[in-house]
């Protein structure tokens, strides 16, 4: 697992209070991890802060799984 993936996993565990083993690439934030729309906004904000990147609203709407977040951040962050 990449450094970015590990950091994403840590943020998801902290913000959603889920077991680390549930945070897999295919896990959907809402359907699999129990997030609501406010949780997803807070996750995006946490990703922006952790990775020093701005995630536009249209991109944020496409980030629905852990893997989506990792792919976006690998492509767009300098961290």
Curated annotation (Swiss-Prot):
Belongs to the acyl carrier protein (ACP) family. GO terms for biological process: lipid A biosynthetic process. It is found in: Cytoplasm. It comes from the Bacteria. 4'-phosphopantetheine is transferred from CoA to a specific serine of apo-ACP by AcpS. This modification is essential for activity because fatty acids are bound in thioester linkage to the sulfhydryl of the prosthetic group. Keywords: Cytoplasm, Fatty acid biosynthesis, Fatty acid metabolism, Lipid biosynthesis, Lipid metabolism, Phosphopantetheine, Phosphoprotein. Pathway: Lipid metabolism; fatty acid biosynthesis. InterPro entries: ACP (IPR003231), ACP-like_sf (IPR036736), PKS_PP-bd (IPR020806), PP-bd_ACP (IPR009081), Ppantetheine_attach_site (IPR006162). It comes from Methylobacterium radiotolerans (strain ATCC 27329 / DSM 1819 / JCM 2831 / NBRC 15690 / NCIMB 10815 / 0-1). It holds the Pfam family PP-binding. Carrier of the growing fatty acid chain in fatty acid biosynthesis. SUPFAM superfamilies: ACP-like. Residues 2-77 form the Carrier domain. The modification O-(pantetheine 4'-phosphoryl)serine is found at residue 37. This is Acyl carrier protein. GO terms for cellular component: cytosol; membrane. One of its GO terms (molecular function) is acyl binding.
């Amino acid at each position: 697992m990449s450094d970015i993936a590990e950091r994403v996993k840590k943020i998801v565990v902290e913000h959603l209070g889920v077991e680390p083993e549930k945070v897999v690439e295919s896990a959907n934030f809402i359907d699999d991890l129990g997030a609501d729309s406010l949780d997803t906004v807070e996750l995006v904000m946490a990703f922006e802060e952790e990775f020093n990147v701005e995630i536009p609203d249209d991109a944020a709407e496409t980030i629905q799984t852990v893997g989506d977040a990792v792919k976006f951040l690998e492509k767009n962050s300098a961290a």
